[in-house]
């Protein structure tokens, strides 16, 4: 009888220990997810940036990589990437370097198609159009004969100009990954087609699928914040062999000199 009681106590103690440990892991994951959200919020809280030129007067996170006389450069990127069955991966991408020292912005609009050829491997076709930003408007730096592309550049909007993450704190059940040795971190969330940002992307691009995307927040560098790291947002609609549809965006604050 005494042995039975001891055995029962041991089992009870073991179950309680496992339960507490499990709660600890859950709390740890929740804590890391909260940290990742806070890290991204430093950038995402700026969205939407109606007037990009406001960034000339906004300073990002600085660390020892910055020269004390360097005001820094904002690097903004948005791209839509579509690969349908039997076709190559087609990408339309805009990147802009906003130098706070000179208060000037230059960049380029790129159209790329990558196809896999059985005889030569991958074949890449790429066209680049240099651009500048004046009075919050994109202007081609060189003459463009193709009026359709010219209009696309002039009417272009970065995701950071219309995206809104005010509800980021309410995103739940994220798949969290953190590697302090790399260092890198990420959080992934399943969205619905009713999500505000998803609607905005579909409004601006012809997304050839009704499938709702997953949102991936992906960062490198110190989780607490580092000017040498990066933060990227990715909306993945389709991801499988021979078929991919995804939209990417990033806003980074870097030491000047990277905008070559």
UniProtKB/Swiss-Prot annotation:
Highest taxon of source: Bacteria
Lipid linkage positions (N-palmitoyl cysteine): 23
Signal peptide: 1-22
Keywords attached to this entry: Cell membrane, Lipoprotein, Membrane, Palmitate, Signal
Pfam families: DUF576
Subcellular location(s) per record: Cell membrane
Lipid bilayer topology: Lipid-anchor
Keyword Membrane annotated: yes
GO CC annotations, alphabetized: plasma membrane
Family according to the record: Belongs to the staphylococcal tandem lipoprotein family.
Annotated NCBIfam families: SA_tandem_lipo
Name of this protein: Uncharacterized lipoprotein SERP2451
Taxonomic lineage: Bacteria, Bacillati, Bacillota, Bacilli, Bacillales
